[in-house]
Amino acid sequence: MTISAPPIIDIRQAGLESSIPDQVVEGLTKEVKTLPALLFYSTKGIQHWNRHSHAADFYPRHEELCILKAEASKMAASIAQDSLVIDMGSASMDKVILLLEALEEQKKSITYCALDLSYSELASNFQAIPVDRFHYVRFAALHGTFDDGLHWLQNAPDIRNRPRCILLFGLTIGNFSRDNAASFLRNIAQSALSTSPTQSSIIVSLDSCKLPTKILRAYTADGVVPFALASLSYANSLFHPKGDRKIFNEEDWYFHSEWNHALGRHEASLITQSKDIQLGAPLETVIVRRDEKIRFGCSYKYDKAERDQLFHSAGLEDAAVWTAPDCDVAFYQLRLRLN
């Protein structure tokens, strides 16, 4: 018997693609120019990112896999029966499948919901899951943003009283500034954990590595350049769907990677190849100077003091930690701080 892939539920509250151009204009007309993260996660962008994250030098994924292979059963044991497990940005399924298999082995009746911006990536990922092997774990897919996912958790009546386990794998929290990371976790805690605080949790991966050579090897590994440049093609298609004009000529740009010691973060930017660049309509008044950085991504690293501050500011406490020898990455189970 063939078991069909789970349905993909559209939980988007607003037109995502209609909002990205506004964010592009806002970011490129500031003194310190930026591009929004959403611009980098088109279907092509996600495919390039998956290739990059599978590169030999990209240690975060390899370390997460190492930990999950060793500790998935303990993670699964910490998740309450009848939980709704929400994967906030599912991307590649090869990591989370280890946790799902452990939940199945423990006969945990849970519903796994993968949240992603890309409909086609959700469909592709679920086609690769052997759902017929699972009898206790049920599957669903959610098409939307982080905010859409939190809104759905708060407002869908049939799931309101179930325990929740929010998965933030892939060093997702590191993509936010430290203040914004605390705000994001606090928002998740208030939206998703408060209905069943003693049984609900967040499982988040964080990276403590601050060794520049290791970090720069990882973040310049194979696949990152096409990932970065795919954003420019996507921007052109959003502003000029007919393809008759361009804001960016992709050949004018290259990817720039650096470690910011003072802020404890890796920074990813686009820089012009060799000259000042005038952007195309509707940003023809914007000149990007030679060697001026357009930053699009940061990956913050967390030592113990920074982790403690993050969790405290978010109103959370760590209930469990899972890591492995020689790994800088670790998974933290966070619960609402009740006192």
Curated annotation (Swiss-Prot):
GO terms for biological process: ergot alkaloid biosynthetic process; methylation. The keyword S-adenosyl-L-methionine applies. Keywords: Alkaloid metabolism, Methyltransferase, S-adenosyl-L-methionine, Transferase. It catalyses: 4-(3-methylbut-2-enyl)-L-tryptophan + S-adenosyl-L-methionine = 4-(3-methylbut-2-enyl)-L-abrine + S-adenosyl-L-homocysteine + H(+). It comes from the Eukaryota. One of its GO terms (molecular function) is methyltransferase activity. Its EC number is 2.1.1.261. InterPro entries: EgtD_Methyltrsf_superfamily, MeTrfase_dom, MeTrfase_EgtD-like, SAM-dependent_MTases_sf, SAM_MeTrfase_EasF-type_put. Coiled coil: none annotated. Pathway: Alkaloid biosynthesis; ergot alkaloid biosynthesis. Methyltransferase that mediates the second step of biosynthesis of ergot alkaloid biosynthesis. Catalyzes the N-methylation of 4-dimethylallyl-L-tryptophan in the presence of S-adenosyl-L-methionine, resulting in the formation of 4-dimethylallyl-L-abrine. Ergot alkaloids, which are produced by endophyte fungi, can enhance plant host fitness, but also cause livestock toxicosis to host plants. Homodimer. Belongs to the methyltransferase superfamily. This is 4-dimethylallyltryptophan N-methyltransferase. It comes from Aspergillus fumigatus.
